[in-house]
Regions:
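Acetyl-CoA-dependent GNAT
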Residues: 3, 7-11, 18-75, 80, ...
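Conserved beta-strand-loop-alpha-helix junction that forms the acyl-donor binding cleft
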Residues: 114-124, 143-146
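Conserved active-site alpha-helix within GNAT-family acetyltransferase domains
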Residues: 95, 107, 119-138
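Conserved GNAT acetyl-CoA-binding A-motif
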Residues: 98, 105-117
Length: 147
């Protein structure tokens, strides 16, 4: 089977929604997913790539990344989401998506790509380590909901 990576389009929202539900367990409404995707696609600081099956263009995974600028280290790109449809995991699609963000980071002169992965996503941690990422630290993820 052959695959290709391209930048996401608003018409990809339904497949991104399906992948979020099936692979990540995020029950976020389709209408909201579409609205968020439209906003994200309009920002020059963000990129969303999808990996598609060559034979029919089916979106099988996606990666969302954005600029990461802090006052205590050089410029990076931050992976905010990487998910592959469970039916297509283990065939290299995640690696294709990582290649896309890493190329973008190099083109922008960034020194690194970073991400935060949930504590319970052990298989994801092994995947990232296999792709050359390293564990830097463990941290707590805090949130204060405003509404």
């Amino acid at each position: 089977m052959s695959w290709y990576v391209r930048l996401a389009r608003l018409s990809d929202a339904e497949r991104i929604y399906d992948i979020n539900m099936g692979s990540l367990g995020y029950d976020y409404p389709l209408c909201d997913t579409r609205e968020r995707l439209e906003k994200i696609l309009s920002r020059p600081t963000d990129r969303v790539w999808v990996v598609c099956r060559e034979e029919d263009g089916l979106v099988c995974g996606y990666l969302h990344a954005a600029d990461y600028e802090v006052l205590y280290m050089g410029s990076m790109k931050n992976i905010l989401a990487l998910a592959v449809d469970e039916a297509f995991q283990g065939v290299g699609l995640g690696r294709l998506l990582l290649n896309a963000v890493e190329d973008w980071a190099r083109d922008c002169g960034c020194y690194a790509v970073r991400l935060v992965s949930g504590f319970n996503r052990v298989n994801a941690h092994q995947f990232y380590l296999h792709c050359g990422y390293r564990m830097r630290k463990e941290e707590k993820n805090l949130i204060k909901e405003l509404y």
